[in-house]
Amino acid sequence: MDREVEVTQVTSVPKAIFTGEPLTVDIEYLVKSQCSGLRFGISIENQLGQRISASYTGREGIESDDVIGINKAVIHFPVINLTPGEYYITVAIHDRSNENLVRIERIEVFEVIAKDVADSGYLIDQSSGIIWLDHKWTL
């Protein structure tokens, strides 16, 4: 069966970031017949398949206007506080009734590179956990 909606490309910009830097994910998609009310989902998983975070436009009250042809959905993360490693992006497109039209797991990968986030001379690594939580000590 020919799909009416297809994901044509997913790109993470940049492909490699240091802990604490921003990340933008572009989801390019093709709509063969005009429609509206498309909702987009994205999740980030680590190498073990653990879901680190997920976002769904339907939960945020956001859906597409009338679209046809090649279009783009963009999500921007101002700060990615993940510890070093490879992370995978899964994307999905649903219709207004939340029917899953497209779901592609691990369609894109990005790398997080170690950084001395506290200017202490120590690089954080996965012994610090999966994410780095901003904090301040008082002694």
Where would I find each of the regions flagged by the language model?
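Localized sequence-composition bias
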Residues: 1-139
